[in-house]
């Protein structure tokens, strides 16, 4: 699975927001100040419609694309079985031959949904390593001879921040602006040699 198309789109979006979007930059003489929205202009939890149109491909980024399936699985799990374990599993090849990559890995991980109301997208899938070490492929059990570490993806998001609508510099109650920000999102885990002490 390649993440390149999604990353290229997010880089393009960042450039557009920085150079071509007057509603985020403010008026021509505001020197790049983002537009300050009132609660009436944009209700809490919503992003500007023009950003939603441009950000249609946001859903191609793995941390965004996984959210709906994770929430559906979590809903089913409440009725069918206990929640997924957070302990390092014993790897039994006969049980995981048709499982997803994160379950067949010798540094297995699970996903959780991270929610931030001041971020757009508000929900992202974060990977969490299940083992401190890695699983020995011969025994199927964890070994401390290797370490599991997270793989991080840089993702462009929009961050809501309080702003002033009257030019006083003091935040106007309920008003906010959108700022672009790159964050590091854990998308998986891999096995590495331990750092020497």
UniProtKB/Swiss-Prot annotation:
InterPro entries named in the record: Cystine-knot_cytokine, IL-17_chr, IL-17_fam
UniProt-listed Gene3D superfamilies: Cystine-knot cytokines
Superkingdom: Eukaryota
Natural source organism: Homo sapiens
GO molecular function: cytokine activity
Family: Belongs to the IL-17 family.
Protein role: Cytokine that plays a crucial role in innate immunity of the epithelium, including to intestinal bacterial pathogens, in an autocrine manner. Stimulates the production of antibacterial peptides and pro-inflammatory molecules for host defense by signaling through the NF-kappa-B and MAPK pathways. Acts synergically with IL22 in inducing the expression of antibacterial peptides, including S100A8, S100A9, REG3A and REG3G. Synergy is also observed with TNF and IL1B in inducing DEFB2 from keratinocytes.
Keyword entries, A-Z: Cytokine, Disulfide bond, Inflammatory response, Secreted, Signal
Pfam families (UniProt xref): IL17 (PF06083)
Localisation per UniProt entry: Secreted
Protein name, entry field: Interleukin-17C
Disulfide bridge positions per record: 129-189, 134-191
Primary location class: secreted
GO biological process per UniProt: cell surface receptor signaling pathway; cell-cell signaling; inflammatory response
